[in-house]
Amino acid sequence: MQDIYFGTYTKRDSKGIYKASFDERTGQLSDLQLVAQEPNPTYLAFSKAGFLYSVGAEEGLGGIASFSPDHQLINHVVDEGAPLCYVSVDEVRGLVYGANYHKGQVLSYRIHEDGHLTFVDQATHQGSGPHENQASPHVHYADLTPDKLLITCDLGTDQVVVYQVDDFGKLTEAQTYQTAPGAGPRHIIFHSHYKTAYLINELNATIDVLFYDGLGYFEHFQTISTLPEDYEGQKWAAAIRLSEDGKFLYASNRAHNSIAVYEILADGSLVLLEIVPTNGLNPRDFILSPDQEYLIAVHQDSDNATVFKRDKETGRLTELSHDFYVPEAVCVLFN
């Protein structure tokens, strides 16, 4: 059995961070438990030491929360305004990074020996974009490049901004990549052995394939849609994941309630294989199982997780179940 964790909104039925068991022999989810009460813990990250870091809030202030390996609250680091929307761990420097969508900020925090966090530095973006959701900067992602630079996706300004980070966590802007106007870059992932990155754009529901030079510079190579050609509804792309072998890429569509499956060719470019329904509403996140045999998608608005069997040879997905209850889930990860 594998432990699988869920970050959630707590606007309706959810009370915080949940854990369930996943059986890799059968693909079944079971035994949902509330492990930590926290308002709107919408994104989660674990350190190798087992500490859990979450989007957090306390007494009307927003920020980040840290929890012990047995899910006990260690501390909050909060400020006026909205909490973060993304958190990630830098094991080498002993830092945690956060993205704040509403404030247009990227932040760094020091991890102390007992797992508690202290604020180190922040950078505030400037600018806007042509889409109605781009009136101001909206930093949606902050994580490491393969060469340990900090990379951020700003949905509000159509920019990917790269930072140098010193050993103490101080941020220095290094490079900026500009996407197509109104694209709304949300998350980015890097191929394990090609010099390519895959940028998912929320507002125009596309994936940009980018050459990456290892120094923070990107060059556009391909743009491909996450939706069927004849689809005329809302464009609202969300999560993006690579298979461990680097042969396949997956992306979720929130309004279309689907997952797009792509083959990765030898030059790093993408070919669409299929778009499969997730049998839920608003599949904001999904994850591949550690053995790569399954894909689990979670739904914010229908309170269910869908399990797909994954063909490792073809990359294609076959639904196994869609009736496991998880309230308001918007983040899923194994630990």
What are these regions (language model features)?
Residues 9-11, 57-59, 101-103, 111, ...:
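Short loop/turn segments immediately following the C-termini of beta-strands
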Residues 21-27, 67-70, 109-118, 164-170, ...:
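Short loop/turn segments immediately following beta-strands, especially the blade-tip
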Residues 30-36, 72-78, 121, 127-132, ...:
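A short beta-strand motif characteristic of beta-propeller blades
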Residues 150-205:
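Loop-centered beta-sheet repeat module
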Residues 38-49, 80-91, 127-147, 179-194, ...:
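Beta-rich, blade/repeat-based domains predominating
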